């Protein structure tokens, strides 16, 4: 009987024999059986195309803000009167150099530190002083024109309420913490916002900057309304509920140049760019960096353009029409982001006005390339400090006015009251601290200090007590 091992060995021998026969029969020239794959043609190198210069516009883009907005810094009605220097009597103990006379018929009205004011006691035993004007002999409280004027509550309570709002706490949450009515908190916010807008306008002007970044922050307004509403009104409120917070900043000093609420259209872009231009000096044209919003190009061209007469191309025929073109010193670049399925898939840079070499030269002080990273980081800070624009919160505003009021508060709080760790400077000599703590080695600085607008960190109480003069003051005041 033949074992199974015999058949296994026989099959193995047959396989080896077949392999040898195939190798002997197979042709040695493999090219005759398997021809080589033809080489693919090398790709034709793309020709470098110079960007086509901007031909210009036949008409200047309209800007409603330039035509209808009043002058943010009105000029004085007359020349300043002579200063009043006290020559007799004891030295004044109360500093009145930061107050102005509000009497419209006074010759010294609106002039700060002119020596025409002196303290005149506390009327009715109150907390605030009464001031006397030596020119018109009028009396007024030192809180006139501030949020503290006419309030029966303590000034510490008002300052703490406003501070909580500036740190991102909602109106109702602040009311519960301090056990006051929410309408009272809202009224204090409205009064503080009006005062702080004037504060920002007074200090932020004629700035010389190297770079400005601008971005839009998505926000949602609450569509909730008490009572019964019609279907058409509900649809209208829902359509206008999504809004954008327009933000502009200086990356070098992190100075917040402007904040506003509106839609993402050309009209809003024109309005916000107009606000930024009002802050800059007339001869200042920094490098502007934005996202890929195309209407921003028209807005910058409106405010930094000029009429240019093109040259003739032919000897005969009518002369070409004048063109509205950007001024030669305008530098503007965009960071265009491509998003698919809520994911960032591509980022490329686009130089709109100027050349790549001049744009890189403008970026040299910060040592970076074209980007909007600084203002993107600022967007997160704004969401953390402004309750109305936070993500997935229940502190939304019902109208644009409420959002603007909270943004006006944060605008001043960010620039003058909030020290930034990236702006601090080392002290020449460490300062000892109270107790057993380590010595102070860093000098805190705010964006306003880094930009040269002030020399100290303001407290929120000092900001709210500051009486804004009605017009700019001479240098050194």
Residue ranges and their predicted role:
Residues 4, 8, 29, 48, ...:
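Intrinsic-disorder-associated, low-complexity terminal segments enriched in Asp/Asn/His/Tyr and depleted
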Residues 42-45, 51-477:
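Residue-level recognition of single "structural anchor" positions
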Residues 29-40:
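Short juxtamembrane segments adjacent to a transmembrane helix
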């Amino acid at each position: 009987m033949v074992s199974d091992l015999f058949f296994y060995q026989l099959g193995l021998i047959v396989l080896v024999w077949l392999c040898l026969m195939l190798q002997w029969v197979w042709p040695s020239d493999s090219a005759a059986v398997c021809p080589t794959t033809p080489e693919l043609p090398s790709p034709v190198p793309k020709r470098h195309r110079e960007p086509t210069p901007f031909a210009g516009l036949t008409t200047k883009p309209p800007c409603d803000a330039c035509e209808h907005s009043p002058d943010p810094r009105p000029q004085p009605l007359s020349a300043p009167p002579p200063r009043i220097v006290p020559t007799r009597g004891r030295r004044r103990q109360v500093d009145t150099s930061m107050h102005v006379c509000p009497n419209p018929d006074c010759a010294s009205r609106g002039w700060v530190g002119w020596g025409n004011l002196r303290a005149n006691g506390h009327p009715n035993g109150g907390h605030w002083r009464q001031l006397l004007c030596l020119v018109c002999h009028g009396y007024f409280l030192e809180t006139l024109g501030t949020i503290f004027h006419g309030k029966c509550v303590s000034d510490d309570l008002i300052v703490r309420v406003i501070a909580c709002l500036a740190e991102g706490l909602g109106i109702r949450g602040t009311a519960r913490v301090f056990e006051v009515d929410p309408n009272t908190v809202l009224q204090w916010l409205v009064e503080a916002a009006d005062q702080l807008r004037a504060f920002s306008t007074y200090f932020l002007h004629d700035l010389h900057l190297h770079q400005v970044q601008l971005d839009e922050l998505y926000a949602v307004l609450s569509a909730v309304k008490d009572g019964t509403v019609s279907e058409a009104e509900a649809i209208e409120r829902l359509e206008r509920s999504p809004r954008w917070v327009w933000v502009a900043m200086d990356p070098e000093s992190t100075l917040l140049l402007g904040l506003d609420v509106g839609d993402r259209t050309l009209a809003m872009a024109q309005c916000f760019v107009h606000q930024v231009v009002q802050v800059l000096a007339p001869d200042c044209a920094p490098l502007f960096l934005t996202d890929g919003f195309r209407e921003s190009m028209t807005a910058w061209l409106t405010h930094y353009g000029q009429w240019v007469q093109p040259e003739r191309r032919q000897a005969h025929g009518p002369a070409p029409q004048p063109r509205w073109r950007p001024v030669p010193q305008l530098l503007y670049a965009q960071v265009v982001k491509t998003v698919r399925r809520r994911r960032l898939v591509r980022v490329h840079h686009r130089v709109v006005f100027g050349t790549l070499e001049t744009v890189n030269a403008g970026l040299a002080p910060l040592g970076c390339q074209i980007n909007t990273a600084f203002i993107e980081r600022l967007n997160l800070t704004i969401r953390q400090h402004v309750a109305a624009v936070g993500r997935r919160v229940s502190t939304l505003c019902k109208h644009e006015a409420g959002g603007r009021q909270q943004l006006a508060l944060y605008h001043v709080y960010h620039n003058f009251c909030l020290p930034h760790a990236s702006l601090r400077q080392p002290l020449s000599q460490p300062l000892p601290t109270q107790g057993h703590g380590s010595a102070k080695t860093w000098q805190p600085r705010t964006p306003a200090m880094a930009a040269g607008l002030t020399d100290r960190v303001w407290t929120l109480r000092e900001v709210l007590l500051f009486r804004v003069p009605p017009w700019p003051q001479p240098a050194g005041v």
